[in-house]
Amino acid sequence: MTISPPEREANGKIVVDRDPVKTSFERWGKPGHFSRSLAKGPNTTTWIWNLHADAHDFDSHTNDLEDISRKVFSAHFGQLAVIFIWLSGMYFHGARFSNYEAWLSDPTHIKPSAQVVWPIVGQEILNGDVGGGFQGVQITSGFFQLWRASGIVNEQQLYTTAIGGLIAAGLMFFAGWFHYHKAAPKLEWFQNAESMMNHHLAGLLGLGSLSWAGHQIHVSLPVNQLLDAGVDPKEIPLPHEFVMNRELMAQLYPSFAKGLAPFFTLNWGEYSDFLTFRGGLNPVTGGLWLTDTVHHHVAIAVLFIVAGHMYRTNWGIGHSMKEILEAHKGPFTGEGHKGLYEILTTSWHAQLGLNLALMGSLSIIVAHHMYAMPPYPYLATDYGTQLSLFTHHMWIGGFCIVGGAAHAAIFMVRDYDPTNNYNNLLDRVIRHRDAIISHLNWVCIFLGFHSFGLYIHNDTMSALGRPQDMFSDTAIQLQPVFAQFVQNRNYLAPGFSAPNALASSSAVWGGDVVAVGGKVAMMPIQLGTSDFLVHHIHAFTIHVTVLILLKGVLFARSSRLIPDKANLGFRFPCDGPGRGGTCQVSAWDHVFLGLFWMYNCLSIVIFHFSWKMQSDVWGSVTAQGVSHITGGNFAQSANTINGWLRDFLWAQASQVIQSYGSALSAYGLMFLGAHFVWAFSLMFLFSGRGYWQELIESIVWAHNKLKVAPAIQPRALSITQGRAVGVAHYLLGGIATTWAFFLARIIAVG
């Protein structure tokens, strides 16, 4: 940390431009108003594609970084407004169309539903019996469990929150307009990294966590304590009574009677009745102990509020981002991070690339924690919701990571300045990119042949009737010894590092089965040869995805094939006429290919999760022991490709294929329709532009014959447009097919 003399740095002030851009509905009503060429209107059908491609590409509207920054800032408010409207809609459905109050009274037998289908052409068949005398569509979003954890006990509270969401959305829309049209920040404000870090760390994350912890302590904890004890939700006092009435709280948590005295006398242990460190799961609800999660949020708040005082602003004390980055150099790293500060304050694509990669990774981490340490009451035994949340957070993470590579490549093409990056780490990485990519390529080939080869060996031995020669837990074992070591170490860890904890962080590591209402919430997950095999497929597909995306970024500006690639832009079909073999080399095309491998990769991950949980974790608990949904068949079947096809895909597709005539029939139709959407994508991916142009010209000729020729000339999609439409339908079709397959299966058997 450095303390600077007062004269060294000018104090930052918040400076805005007043009324910089006129509010004009007339201008907004004109399609393509942001571009001179688009504003002229359409001559050919390509116009509508360019309109969509460029509407949010603010770089193409202007070169003025200040105006681009303001547009991005304003758009963020619009994004938040849409999120608030969506959230409000969720809460409104909970209030108006759901069985939330019934579910709250008996969460182990009644299933969550917040959607009732109208009886038009027989669609009321979709309203299944979810228990408690309610007919509706079973939902798997986890909102009911979240609401219970928040301390919501009736529909009135959901209505109120829904209205609050709409008010928040209105405020966001207003802020977005106000900060672009009325008081727009100057560029310096957007580039003041230290202030931004302090405010986001201390304000957003620190005070955000603290206020949530406050809500949990004063509302969630007492409400959940009473619900767990079997008190009727209608008898539970209203939230403000817990907040106002200390005696009421002291009945549940005796330390409340002492007020703030223990805090100021440093006897913080007094508060251990509601700030706990138990570990494991609450045996009543199958969720994390809420007193543990409150403790976690208080701790997070303290950490981030401290972190939010770390950077030097107007007080001449603290860290400077630029100084930290420029001091970051070692004996083998040349100029180190010199020049990165300038990149991160002038290229929003560089910022976005980093943030997407990190947020995507975080989403994948969340997916894994949500099942291993279920944070909300009765979430763990709602298998459909558990499967949906895992799948959802994996897909979101995958898309964010690919988006990170996309914006990193856009940064390389549009914003990278070689003169400011001489011999720093970025320059050095780009200069030895051949070594990086060729080594990564070797790793991909090694992983691909070896992981796939193990399966091929097993399929061959299985077909020849030689089970004793297969890699399996009962023949030639390939145990994941390192993973088993990590599991065991985490299981034993509390004994060494947290002796007062009742259990380890997750039941996954070892210990007893946690059962709620006769269903397994979580239990130790045994890893064996089948897991070892599929984990190496995961390693292979992850590395190939990274290879494609990283090659796209590192070769975005130039390559041996096309030395002047930077001049062609982020997306281009080929390097002009007369240069064969230069198509599909743009940075955009690498993102396009990366999306397919991301899809491959995550499909195998969610299939592994779905089958492993049904085989080894989820099931019912009786006096005789645990009976799993698929009876532990993962270890025997998942070590051959045939086993995956026969005992997972085919065996578990029976529910969706046979769903017609039942409340799950919508999933059967979606399964069919999404397959169709997926197949439709192939028409775009395997086609040539000239073929369609010829066909279009025939059709236009016929229209001319009939004197009904269109004024806007029809054009075949460009190569890039066709690939974009293709990959969009490929992913949409694939994801919706998987969705229907998973939900029909797990709702039927779970």
UniProtKB/Swiss-Prot annotation:
Class of this enzyme: oxidoreductase
GO biological process: photosynthesis
Annotated residues for binding of chlorophyll a: M683, Y691
GO cellular component: a single term: photosystem I
GO MF terms, alphabetically ordered: 4 iron, 4 sulfur cluster binding; chlorophyll binding; electron transfer activity; magnesium ion binding; oxidoreductase activity
Gene it is expressed from: psaA
Residue sites binding phylloquinone per the record: W692
Binding residue positions for chlorophyll a': H675
UniProt EC number: 1.97.1.12
Keywords, sorted A to Z: 4Fe-4S, Chlorophyll, Chloroplast, Chromophore, Electron transport, Iron, Iron-sulfur, Magnesium, Membrane, Metal-binding, Oxidoreductase, Photosynthesis, Photosystem I, Plastid, Thylakoid, Transmembrane, Transmembrane helix, Transport
Principal subcellular localization: plastid
Compartments where located: Plastid, Chloroplast thylakoid membrane
Lineage top rank: taxon: Eukaryota
Quaternary organization: The PsaA/B heterodimer binds the P700 chlorophyll special pair and subsequent electron acceptors. PSI consists of a core antenna complex that captures photons, and an electron transfer chain that converts photonic excitation into a charge separation. The eukaryotic PSI reaction center is composed of at least 11 subunits.
Species this protein is from: Mesostigma viride
Lineage, uppermost ranks: Eukaryota, Viridiplantae, Streptophyta, Mesostigmatophyceae, Mesostigmatales
UniProt name for this protein: Photosystem I P700 chlorophyll a apoprotein A1
